[in-house]
């Protein structure tokens, strides 16, 4: 059976999570009212998100993530083999973040996003310039796994 989602209606239910930072936990994100799991999709979920501030570095070991900007603006920072790439995104733009690539969002004035996110997701719970500089042991000590 097809799943039909009223995106505008679902996003309308959200409250802007203000002042998001890399250390914001999964429990804090869920309790904020700024995140909604709209549907299961393949090996992950379709999420609606509203926040201002800086998100944690994250990566998705099992697939690419689709991100669409609906309202506001954000800078998507992607850590590539050649270093940091930053992309200014505004409403109507879609980004495809490659599998297992560290990335984060910076939205000082606020953004509303729809994502198709594969699970699990690794969130790095410390503010660091380049997550690739951490050893495997350091990563284990600072990664919060999100499973849906």
Question: Where do the protein language model's features map onto the residues?
Answer:
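Short beta-turn/strand-loop junction motif enriched in small, turn-promoting residues
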Residues: 53-56, 100-102
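Short, conserved beta-strand element in jelly-roll/cupin
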Residues: 50-52, 61-80, 116
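Ligand-binding loop in jelly-roll beta-barrel domains
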Residues: 90, 99-127
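Structural motif
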Residues: 45, 66, 73-75, 102, ...
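Short histidine-centered beta-strand/loop micro-motifs
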Residues: 37-40, 56-61, 78-79, 86-88, ...
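A short, N-terminal "cap"/entry segment at the start of jelly-roll beta-barrel domains
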Residues: 1-47, 56-57, 138-148
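A generic hydrophobic-segment detector
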Residues: 115-148
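Short acidic-glycine-tyrosine-enriched beta hairpin
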Residues: 80-99
């Amino acid at each position: 059976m097809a799943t039909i989602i009223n995106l505008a209606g679902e996003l309308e239910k959200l409250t802007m999570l203000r002042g998001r930072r890399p250390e914001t936990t999964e429990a804090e994100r869920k309790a904020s009212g700024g995140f909604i799991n709209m549907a299961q999709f393949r090996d992950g979920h379709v999420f609606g998100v509203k926040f201002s501030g800086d998100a944690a570095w994250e990566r998705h070991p099992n697939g690419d993530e689709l991100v669409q900007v609906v309202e506001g603006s954000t800078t998507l920072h992607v850590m590539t083999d050649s270093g940091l790439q930053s992309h200014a995104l505004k409403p109507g733009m879609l980004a495809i973040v490659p599998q297992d690539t560290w990335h984060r969002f910076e939205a000082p004035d606020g953004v509303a996003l729809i994502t198709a996110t594969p699970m699990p997701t690794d969130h790095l719970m410390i503010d660091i310039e380049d997550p690739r500089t951490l050893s495997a042991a350091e990563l284990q000590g600072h990664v919060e796994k999100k499973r849906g």
